[in-house]
Design a protein with these regions (language model features):
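A nucleotide-sugar donor-handling region in carbohydrate enzymes
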Residues: 42-139, 165
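Donor-nucleotide binding loops and adjacent catalytic segments primarily
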Residues: 104-204, 255
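A short helix->loop->beta-strand "cap" motif at the edges of active sites that frequently abuts
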Residues: 32-37, 69, 94-95, 158, ...
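Short acidic-hydrophobic, aromatic-tinged amphipathic segments that line or gate anion-handling sites
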Residues: 98-101, 189-190, 250-258
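A donor-sugar binding/catalytic signature common to diverse glycosyltransferases
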Residues: 193-238
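Conserved nucleotide-sugar donor-interacting segment of glycosyltransferase catalytic cores
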Residues: 2-66
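C-terminal amphipathic helix plus adjacent low-complexity
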Residues: 264-313
Length: 313
């Protein structure tokens, strides 16, 4: 901070850092670089209201957000989850909080046709993408999916790509690979930097409920069955529940996850009509709004105003 002397300091999720490590930096900048502007960036949902309120009171986050930050930006929509009301923001904190909408994910690097050709998928085949995020706790979802395919879709050739995640424990990965490899229409990737391309090519996505994955699903207007994580925080569960109530995806509670139940919901989604733009009323304008908000904040700084002046050519 002393070296960079930032004009704007953007902090993600926790006002003083993951383990309080930003407190000293915030204190330093306050006294040695008072012109720095501060923005706290929050996801649409942090945790349940009782858990979040208790944590913010315990960690003094309300005071920090009110006293140290110029603005709070929430990358979500109040129609889905009104964090300002749910988390009981004070009038002072409400006044500096803005909902930016959801982040529209960029398109993939490969066309759906190229992906389907790569995986040997014909026009008549159905293609399901399974993605349990990083994979650390994704074994149950993938295991149940494979059981559903074996028990309930044995008479159908459904092309499946499982992107297991680089954090899946080695023993669990080996267990899954031993079952996937003998089946010609089942495919495995541990990780891909181009998940959006595979998602765009899929007829259905089966996933957990993390912010990035759900944003990709909604950006691409894909039919999806989401099995959210319910612990240690309720973020994914609340997100999936609210979106399911809005009719933009299907949700299964992990305690209700069985091969038969998953197969039933997948069958219903595979036979439903494709998603169309009119099905979605979600706001996906976070990136342009954030860009505008950055410029508005920085235009107040003399050093930045000089950079914005037109250059004679």
């Amino acid at each position: 901070a002393a070296h960079f002397q930032p004009d704007l300091f953007l902090v993600d999720k926790k006002p003083n850092g993951l383990q309080g490590e930003l407190q000293a930096t915030l204190d330093y900048l306050k006294y040695h670089h008072p012109q720095t502007r501060y923005v706290l960036l929050l996801r649409d949902i942090l945790d349940s209201a009782p858990a979040t309120i208790a944590q913010w009171q315990r960690e003094n986050y309300y005071f920090l957000a009110e006293s140290r930050y110029d603005q709070v930006w929430i990358v979500g929509s109040p129609e889905i989850f009104n964090a300002v009301e749910e988390y009981r923001f004070s009038p002072t904190l409400k006044a500096k909080t803005q909902f930016m909408g959801y982040i529209r994910r960029p398109p993939g690097l490969q066309s759906p046709q190229a992906i389907r050709q790569k995986l040997g998928i014909t026009e008549k085949d159905r293609f399901i993408l399974v993605t349990p995020g990083g994979g650390k706790d994704g074994f149950c979802l993938v295991d149940t999916y494979l059981q559903a395919q074996t028990q309930c879709f044995s008479d159908q050739k459904i092309i499946s790509l499982i992107v297991g995640g680089s954090e899946m424990p080695l023993a669990q990965k080996h267990d899954l690979l031993a079952r996937i490899r003998p089946v010609s229409h089942w495919h495995w990737l541990e990780f891909t930097p181009d998940l959006a391309s595979y998602m765009a090519a899929a007829d259905l996505v089966v996933s957990m409920g993390g912010y990035n994955t759900v944003s990709e699903i909604l950006s691409l207007q894909k039919r999806a069955v989401v099995v959210p994580r319910i612990e240690p925080v309720a973020e994914q569960w609340i997100r999936a529940q609210r979106l399911a109530e809005g009719g933009v995806l299907r949700m299964l509670h992990p305690q209700q996850l069985t091969p038969q139940r998953l197969a039933t919901v997948m069958s219903e989604e595979l036979t439903a009509s494709p998603r169309v733009a009119s099905d979605y009323t979600l706001d996906f304008n976070a990136l342009p709004r954030i860009t505008e908000a950055f410029l508005r904040l920085l235009e107040q700084e003399d050093s930045f105003k000089e950079l914005l002046q037109p250059i004679a050519v």
